[in-house]
Curated annotation (Swiss-Prot):
One of its GO terms (molecular function) is DNA binding. This is UvrABC system protein C. The gene is uvrC. Gene3D superfamilies: 5' to 3' exonuclease, C-terminal subdomain, GIY-YIG endonuclease, UVR domain, UvrC, RNAse H endonuclease domain. The keyword DNA damage applies.
């Protein structure tokens, strides 16, 4: 028996979306299939303390050795996919229906003179049209209850129909307008069959024309002041919209297609494939592959199609430098080439690819990108699964102790460091056309993010400072210089402070071992800010940013090299690693764990900087000259704006007029007049007006919305 904790997914790796999940044993056999509105919440229940679980659930989770899942858009999709997988895998821990029959379908007995709508199980019969299957019979009855208001077809058995005809009275459904009562001659056979055919068309997905027709009739009834009829039509429209929730996992009209989607970054790509046969998802496969070089999504599609369908070896070699990592295997049914293949982008030479596929299949094959409708929705579902598989792969890789150790060892070797860089700090600068310039510092220790050590910097501007490079706060190079200078100035200040408050003999050689200088604040017990020196500094950028960071360290007397604080930069376009005072970058292998770690660190710094920049930009959009008035809080600012209407009108008012506003005294009114006069447009020392970067609007004349 396995311990469920041994295969529990990493925290945060399970999405909070609808989906279907599978527990497997050590041999890959599916033990249990379930569905959930919220996968994270549902799966968390299985990994609770064993003694709190139902005995059958205890046995299942102890017998399993892995769990995987597929995300879908709605609960309806989850029901359909759950049914498909239960039928396909026959999991021994799934509950059987009491009648031990197949799942129910909504059947229409078209072979009868007066067709009947009913719940039907078992093998299909000739002359009967089926919709479904459904997971539960009550789901069919709920659907019928909604649709019979619009399509009042017969639902009674043959005996009930015959008795009603004999006595000349319909059943209850006939009296409440849920049946057109053909048993007593209210409609003839042709009219009743027309109702049934309309019902079948609607259930097949042709919903638009019925809804449009009913909406026209509702508007006409309202114009004719037939309000009761208009209200009924309104309710009918609502019933139709509730009854049929579009299903992205199921395609109408028995479509056979393979649906392919990708999620990728610079080094890897995840591919997910749904195999649709007879309009239903019959299988799913997924891989994560390494990219050998710079390839587009269209290139990935071409490689996948040729190798998966023509080589007969599967997708294991698709754009890879080695073996692939299977992410999900759900009983693929992709051995044959379908008539239609849906992809996110057409291959560069689509004609040649389709010709090869057609020759292998023996008939025409269409490769296309769906733009709208059910097929587009299904492709988006597959894309979500590819992204989820890719995110899960990255999470597993990042949390793999062996991979992290290898990454740090590779970094040590590539950058010629004396020790593995156990503490890495990465810096990134973010701005919008030189405004609201900010920088971020993220910290990775032992290859994992340490978010409590993250720091943010509002760039103040360093124009004219020696060694700053080009001038201006909006200059990324100058901003990087300022950020590095401020961070390590704080470090030196903290080190000096520790030396001042402690006995030098007890601290040891601070200059030689700065990390050993007791960087814990005795008052709070927490680490001092900026007290720890990094083993490696990474800047987001190429040679110019690295040179600026090196100048900042040099000015502070810190060696930017293997003997001091190691420094490098990661350029985005080609993922090159730049070192100080080198003409050429270091090129790490694209499959290198070291490069993967540097990317994660750089991407995290970029995310953190962007978040802070957006916060600053949002604040600037609602700033005004009133913010400069000392002692004027948000409540009184709003009161002033409500009273006068805008900052410009407040500026034109006298101190006496301003003092009439509730909560504003004479002293505060005088301070407001002085501050607004100082910031008046046209003065040489007036600050530039705040401008909304999205619209170009000058926000100095802020008004109350």
């Amino acid at each position: 028996m396995a311990d469920p904790a041994s295969y529990r997914p990493a925290p945060g790796s399970i999405p909070e979306t609808p989906g279907v999940y599978r527990f497997r044993d050590e041999h890959g056999r599916v033990l249990y299939v379930g569905k959930a509105k919220n996968l994270r919440a549902r799966l968390a229940n299985y990994f609770a303390e064993l003694h709190t679980l139902h005995p059958r659930t205890q046995h299942m989770v102890s017998s399993a050795s892995s769990v995987d899942w597929t995300v879908v858009s709605t609960e309806v999709e989850a029901l359909q996919l759950e049914y498909t997988w239960i039928k396909q895998f026959d999991p021994r821990f799934n509950v059987r229906y009491r009648d031990d029959k197949s799942y129910p379908s909504l059947a229409v007995t078209l072979h009868e003179e007066f067709p009947r709508l009913q719940v039907m199980r078992g093998p299909k019969r000739k002359g009967v049209r089926y919709f479904g299957p459904y997971a539960h019979a009550w789901a069919i009855r709920e659907t019928l209850d909604l649709l019979l208001r619009v399509f009042p077809a017969r639902t009674c058995s043959g005996g009930v129909f015959k008795r009603a005809a004999q006595v000349g009275r319909p059943c209850l459904l006939g009296y409440i307008d849920r049946c057109s009562a053909p048993c007593v001659g209210r409609v003839d056979a042709a009219t009743h069959r027309e109702i049934v055919e309309d019902f079948c068309d609607f259930m097949s997905g042709q919903t638009g024309r019925y809804l449009r027709r009913l909406e026209r009739e509702m508007q006409q009834a309202a114009q004719a002041q037939e309000y009761e009829r208009a209200a009924r039509l309104r309710d009918d429209i609502g019933a139709l919209r509730r009854a049929v929730e579009k299903q992205a996992v199921v395609l109408p009209d028995g479509t056979d297609a393979d649906v392919i989607a990708f999620a990728e970054d610079e080094l890897e790509a995840a591919v997910a494939v749904f195999y649709v046969r007879g309009g239903r998802v019959r299988g799913q496969r997924g891989w994560v592959v390494d990219k050998l070089d710079e390839v587009t999504t269209a290139d990935l599609v071409e490689q996948f199609l040729t190798q998966e369908y023509l080589d007969g070896t599967g997708a294991a070699s698709t754009g890879t430098a080695g073996s692939t990592v299977p992410t999900t295997t759900a009983g693929s049914q992709g051995e044959g080439i379908p008539r239609e293949i849906l992809v996110p982008a057409l291959p560069p030479d689509v004609e040649a690819v389709t010709e090869l596929l057609g020759a292998a299949r023996g008939s025409r094959v269409e490769v296309r990108v769906p733009r709208r409708g059910d097929k587009r929705t299904l492709l988006e579902t597959v894309e979500r699964n590819a992204k989820q598989a890719f995110a899960l792969h990255r999470t597993k890789r990042a949390s793999d102790l062996t991979a992290r150790s290898r990454a740090l060892a590779e970094l040590q070797e590539a950058l010629e460091l004396p020790d593995a860089p156990l503490r890495i700090e990465c810096f990134d600068v973010s701005n919008t056309q030189g405004t609201n310039v900010v920088a971020s510092m993220v910290v990775f220790e032992d290859g994992l993010p340490r978010k409590s050590e993250y720091r943010r910097f509002a760039i103040r501007g360093i124009a004219g400072r020696e060694g700053a490079g080009r001038e201006g706060a909006g200059d990324d190079v100058a901003s990087m210089y300022e950020t590095i200078h401020r961070r390590f100035s704080r470090y030196l200040a903290e080190r000096s402070r520790i030396a001042d408050i402690a006995d030098i003999a007890e601290l040891g050689d601070i200059a030689g071992a700065p990390g050993a200088a007791q960087p814990i604040d005795p008052g709070t017990g927490r680490p001092r800010r900026f007290a720890y020196p990094p083993n490696l500094v990474v800047v987001d950028g190429g040679a110019p940013q690295v040179a600026a960071a090196a100048r900042a360290l040099d000015e502070l007397g810190i060696d930017a090299g293997p003997g001091g604080v190691a420094l490098c930069g990661l350029a985005k376009r080609l993922e090159e690693v730049w070192l100080p005072d080198t003409a050429d970058p270091v090129i790490l292998p694209r499959t290198s764990e070291a490069l993967y770690l540097l990317q994660r660190v750089r991407d995290e710094a970029h995310r953190f900087a962007i978040a802070y920049h957006r916060q600053k930009r949002s604040t600037a959009m609602v700033a005004s000259a009133l913010d400069e008035v000392p002692g004027l809080g948000d409540t009184r600012r709003k009161a002033l704006l409500r009273h006068f209407g805008s900052v410009a009108k407040i500026r034109a008012a006298s101190a006496e007029q301003i003092a009439q506003v509730s909560g504003i005294g004479p002293r505060t009114a005088a301070a407001i007049v002085t501050a607004l006069a100082r910031s008046a447009p046209g003065r040489a020392d007036a600050p530039a007006p705040v401008v909304d970067p999205r619209t170009g609007e000058i926000l100095d004349t802020e008004t109350v919305s």
